[in-house]
Amino acid sequence: MEKLALFDIDYTITRKETLMEFFKYLVSKDIKNIKFLPRALYSGLMYGIKVYDEKRVKECFLKFIENIDEKELAILTKSFYDERLSTILYEDAVNMIKKLKNEGYMVILISASPEFYIKEFYAIKEVDLIIGTKFIFENGKFVRKMSGNNCKGEEKVKRLEKVLKEKNMKEYMDERTED
């Protein structure tokens, strides 16, 4: 029986919330992106008072990369990982990933963060699979629309179950909650 090691990303293997770090990183690369700060604050407020759900808040928030070319976004996310994400990793978490992989575990990172940048965590060679929130690209451009649901809570469980089924694996857990 193959053993699984599941890790969330934000505040589990990173010290900070990665989507905000992505926004801050792009502002540091082009100060003109600061014009999207009011939208970010508004989105957060609407989520905080329960007017927006997580899907809508993410779609609204990501205006700062709307219509960016998919290849350009890939270059940005690679530099984001190299210059920023890799500096906020918990060393203990990375060491645990390496230890568990060495013990024969299949290592999966599963997060509500956008998959278009968390896939850069494959730079940690012990990571076997990354599951995140998927977004749509149309004609090679980012369009701020989520493909399906935000990968959090029950959706995270569904996505994991789908992967396990595809790999012909079984799951056993004592609780079906995740915050």
Each model region followed by its residue ranges:
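Short, surface-exposed acidic
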Residues: I34-F36, K71, K170-M173
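C-terminal cap/substrate-recognition subdomain and adjoining C-terminal extension
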Residues: E2, I75, D82-I108, A112-D179
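Conserved active-site and cofactor/substrate-binding residues in soluble primary-metabolism enzymes
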Residues: E17, I68, E155
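Short, compositionally biased "basic patch" segments
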Residues: G44-I49, K58-E70, I130, K134
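Active-site neighborhood of HAD-like aspartate-dependent phosphohydrolases
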Residues: M1-I49
